[in-house]
Amino acid sequence: MVKHAVEANFDGLVGPTHNYAGLSWGNVASKSNVNAVANPREAALQGLAKMKRLADRGYVQGILPPHERPHIPTLRALGFEGNERQILEAVAKADPTILAAVSSASCMWTANAATVSPSADTADHRVHFTPANLSAKFHRSIEHQVTGRSLKAIFGDESYFAHHPALPSVSHFGDEGAANHTRLCSRYGEPGVELFVYGQVAFNESAPAPGKYPARQTLEASRAIARLHGLTDRHAVFAQQNPAAIDAGVFHNDVIAVGNGNCLFYHEQAFLDEARVLADIQERLTGAELEAVRVSSTQVPIEDAVASYLFNSQLLNTADGMLLAVPGECREVASVSRYLDELVKADTPITAVEVFDVKQSMRNGGGPACLRLRVVLNDDELHAINRGVILTDALYERLTSWVEAHYRDQLSQQDLADPMLLEEVRKALDELTGILGLGSIYDFQL
């Protein structure tokens, strides 16, 4: 008997050190806004507003907490000594880029937090989580330990949930989490097909690979995740992302494709072997025909797709079809805006488009899809999670007040060395773990 299930979205709450340091080579938006003055308060409120709109529509909306930044334990591991004030002064003087890296609020993009396999797909019928090692970027490679603690604090019942450590943090097993993973199915509670998208084959130097920008996800990492999660060949498809797309600024597959249910919405340049990918999915998809919504380069040039983040949108079930939740930038790019008007009139599962303002995140290269981790849960599993992280009207009001009390409305690169900022962050996070009922998850709390 198939159990009823929902796809819950767990959005990253933007952290108090949200800034524009331009740390992500291959992420065009991140590099183009380097050294701009950020507004952490506005960023967090924009993220909360997006969550609230979706929760108000009846979607299960959860929250993943920000991380402690600047991260003093990492600076100590890099040889900076003394008390915390002295450490911040020393790193700001010696190498401001390192300070920017350990101060990044990049954990807000929870599509990179982990890969999640629903219980309907796994051998032991538990929901499996593997935090992404994010080894391609130093500032993100320090996230997975706290991410793992957060996930265990939320999904703690071992009879329903299985947690794995991140893969070895080396380039051969570079893993970027759910940003390179999507699941297709007839219904959420039915066994589905998990699409793992990789950029290169690490142990085969002759295999196709991008030339300008690095491929962050390897086939070896994707296969390892599938093994850890107990997925059979019937539940997994491995597809290579088009190297030309990576070189055009598509640093994760969720910048060029998004799936939901039996619908795959993608650009024609997304996959290296498009026909084989679609055939492999359809062969494994039970109970439904694959609805492939293909966007041609004539309709939307890949440069416009990257500039607008058309595909970094959330694709959500509605009563009469699917809703595409797009960033506001989609209405600022003519080809994309025109395409969206045509899309809702066409014969596809996508029947509605709604615009969301996540501009503070977009300037660092993260749209609506980057900000959320999808977790399919049946009714028993949903009942077993820590309900303190599920957004309600009361929690929204409390978190809004919390942000307004603790977040600055301006943050520049020079501010990262301010020892008061670290104190402000810790005070805020200590209060947040109480609000969400997470217990002690941060290094300063342990």
From Swiss-Prot:
Main enzyme class = hydrolase
Q: Which residues does UniProt assign to the signal peptide?
A: none
Kindly indicate whether the keyword Hydrolase belongs to this entry.
Answer: yes
Task: Keywords in alphabetical order, please.
Answer: Arginine metabolism, Hydrolase
The pathway noted for it is: Amino-acid degradation; L-arginine degradation via AST pathway; L-glutamate and succinate from L-arginine: step 2/5
Task: Give me the reactions it catalyses.
Answer: N(2)-succinyl-L-arginine + 2 H2O + 2 H(+) = N(2)-succinyl-L-ornithine + 2 NH4(+) + CO2
Role according to the record: Catalyzes the hydrolysis of N(2)-succinylarginine into N(2)-succinylornithine, ammonia and CO(2).
Listed name of the protein: N-succinylarginine dihydrolase
Which organism does this record belong to?
Answer: Marinobacter nauticus (strain ATCC 700491 / DSM 11845 / VT8) (Marinobacter aquaeolei)
